[in-house]
From Swiss-Prot:
Has a ubiquitin-protein ligase activity acting as an E3 ubiquitin protein ligase or as an ubiquitin-ubiquitin ligase promoting elongation of ubiquitin chains on substrates. By mediating 'Lys-48'-linked polyubiquitination of proteins could target them for proteasomal degradation. May also function as a chaperone, playing a role in transport to the cell membrane of BSG/Basigin for instance. Probable inactive PPIase with no peptidyl-prolyl cis-trans isomerase activity. As a component of the minor spliceosome, involved in the splicing of U12-type introns in pre-mRNAs. The gene is PPIL2. It is an enzyme of class 2 (transferase). Residues 456-520 are annotated as: Disordered. This is RING-type E3 ubiquitin-protein ligase PPIL2. It catalyses: S-ubiquitinyl-[E2 ubiquitin-conjugating enzyme]-L-cysteine + [acceptor protein]-L-lysine = [E2 ubiquitin-conjugating enzyme]-L-cysteine + N(6)-ubiquitinyl-[acceptor protein]-L-lysine. Residues 197-217 form a coiled coil. PANTHER family: PEPTIDYL-PROLYL CIS-TRANS ISOMERASE-RELATED (PTHR45625), RING-TYPE E3 UBIQUITIN-PROTEIN LIGASE PPIL2 (PTHR45625:SF1). Its EC number is 2.3.2.27. GO terms for cellular component: catalytic step 2 spliceosome; cytoplasm; Golgi lumen; nucleoplasm; nucleus; plasma membrane. It comes from Homo sapiens (Human). CDD domains: cyclophilin_RING, RING-Ubox_PPIL2. One of its GO terms (biological process) is mRNA processing. Gene3D superfamilies: Cyclophilin-like, Single helix bin, Zinc/RING finger domain, C3HC4 (zinc finger). It holds the Pfam family Pro_isomerase.
Length: 520
């Protein structure tokens, strides 16, 4: 290996390397910019034509595309020159049995390499070989199909394989300048998403039709666009933190500018649960007897409110206990009786409320059944014995305080060993709510707000009235020192003794040099 082999290696890309190896502008290659337009395509839409017409120069267009262009621009789309619609010539292409364009005389199929011409007077299209042999060389200038006379100048070249400049799409005037004709019907159709679905099967179309019928996206969007209603903040529901709108408007230009801090409003349920201090009591009337339940409303307020509200709306009336396991639990609260149904009072599952001082210890513990974390609805179960392993899995919200003999009778009913369903129906006929702490909490909150409304005007009146002695000090003149009494300053000056007459001046002792050490 030679020395200094990496001496010319750079830690950066040089200009020459970037130009030749890693990027940079490449030299233009004219042949790569050539885009060939087939002879059977419209020079404006660049799509196969249906009603072909041509200009005196032999540029082919589709009648449905060129007419709107001429109405708007009045120019030739390929070169930008003025063009009159009356100068367009209708072309009559012939097709063979396979549906391909061909010469009606020689029956040669037209390709992109065929020399194609048309007669101006009739619009018939032929291969150049047929016109050259039968018209030009024979000096018989009559149409080969209709026998109509024409001149040498009436022969229009539509395609010459040796001169393809007019078929170069890259040189078209409307392509270079990005000029288009906007069809109102097409623009309206583009607003429908199905416009962009070209190939769909029957199943997809049926699914889309069903989606369009049930789609409520516009309603949801309109609901989200509405400004949320501001909660009324008072002394009871005012949080110790602000809404954060001031800082948000300061850091984001998308927010509406805010300059005043507003206290955030505490959720109404959180406020109500602070006033719930009592237990709730409910009785279940079953076909086996009555069960008296005590609800821990002060510990699990959300779960207990759900149970009490469902009992008050008679949600559990007529439901059965669909699952019973001896020495374990009995479960109910499902209107369908299958163990998979039921809804909460609010129509959606709510969160678990685990408390360390509540455990599945003992007989008659009332707890919520669920299908996983935070999936509580309406189903509940009552334990027949201690089940401590269910702690922190199911929310305990009450216990049985009366009717243990009824609970024993329920346990003695035999169940199907495969499905755990009682062979004899155990049904809840009705429910009775004796104590509802939430009504008392609502009444207490309403009373607190009434007293606040009464106290607020009185405090405003007191604050508006000036208090005794709260007036400003007396002014004696304008400007600096306007509160100073001139008489007080004069009296103080007269009573002040003269220091020059009473205090004697102390005499300085002359210094006598070093002296001796007697004073040391």
């Amino acid at each position: 290996m030679g020395k200094r082999q990496h001496q010319k290696d750079k830690m950066y890309i040089t200009c020459a390397e970037y130009t030749h190896f890693y990027g940079g502008k490449k030299p233009d290659l004219p042949q790569t910019n050539f885009r060939r337009l087939p002879f059977d395509h419209c020079s404006l839409s660049l799509q196969p034509f249906v009603y072909p017409v041509c200009t005196p120069d032999g540029i082919v267009f589709d009648l449905l595309n060129i007419v709107p262009w001429l109405k708007k621009y009045g120019t030739n789309p390929s070169n930008g020159e003025k063009l009159d619609g009356r100068s367009l010539i209708k072309l009559n292409f012939s097709k063979n049995s396979e549906g391909k364009y061909h010469c009606p005389v020689l029956f040669t199929v037209f390709t992109n390499n065929t020399h194609i011409v048309a007669v101006r007077t009739t619009g018939n299209v032929y291969a150049y070989e047929a016109v050259e042999q039968l018209n030009i060389k024979a000096k018989n200038f009559r149409d080969l199909l209709t026998d109509e006379p024409f001149s040498r100048q009436d022969i229009i070249t539509l395609q010459d394989p040796t001169n393809l400049d007019k078929f170069n799409v890259s040189n078209f005037y409307h392509v270079k300048n990005n000029m288009k004709i906007i069809d109102p019907d097409e623009e309206k159709a583009k607003q429908d998403p199905s416009y962009y679905l070209k190939n769909t099967n029957a199943e997809t179309r049926e699914t889309l039709q069903e989606l369009y019928k049930e789609f409520k996206g516009d309603e949801i969007l309109a609901a989200t666009m509405k400004a949320p209603e501001k909660k009324k903040v008072d002394k009871l529901n005012a949080a110790h933190y602000s809404t954060g709108k001031v800082s948000a408007s300061f850091t984001s230009t998308a927010m509406v500018p805010e300059t005043t801090h507003e206290a955030a409003a505490i959720d109404e349920d959180v406020l109500r649960y602070q006033f719930v201090k009592k237990k709730g009591y409910v009785r279940l009337h079953t076909n086996k007897g009555d069960l008296n339940l005590e609800l821990h409303c002060d510990l699990t307020p959300k779960t207990c409110e759900n149970f009490i509200r469902l009992c008050k709306k008679h949600y559990y009336d007529g439901t059965i206990f669909h699952r019973s396991i001896r020495n374990f639990v009995i479960q109910g609260g499902d209107p369908t009786g299958t163990g998979t149904g039921g809804e909460s009072y609010w129509g959606k599952p709510f969160k678990d409320e685990f408390r360390p001082n509540l455990s599945h210890t003992g007989r008659g513990i009332l707890s919520m059944a669920n299908s996983g974390p935070n999936s509580n609805r309406s189903q509940f179960f009552i334990t027949f014995r201690s089940c401590a392993y269910l702690d922190k899995k199911h929310t305990i919200f009450g216990r049985v305080v009366g009717g243990f003999d009824v609970l024993t009778a329920m346990e003695n009913v035999e169940s199907d060993p495969k499905t755990d369903r009682p062979k004899e129906e155990i049904r809840i006929d009705a429910t009775t709510v004796f104590v509802d702490p939430y009504e008392e909490a609502d009444a207490q909150i309403a009373q607190e707000r009434k007293t606040q409304l009464k106290v607020a005007p009185e405090t405003k009146v007191k604050s508006s009235q000036p208090q005794a002695g709260s007036q400003g000090p007396q002014t004696f003149r304008q400007g600096v020192g306007k509160y100073i009494n001139p008489a007080a300053t004069k009296r103080a000056a007269e009573e002040e003794p003269s220091t020059s007459a009473t205090v004697p001046m102390s005499k300085k002792k002359p210094s006598r040099g070093f002296g001796d050490f007697s004073s040391w």
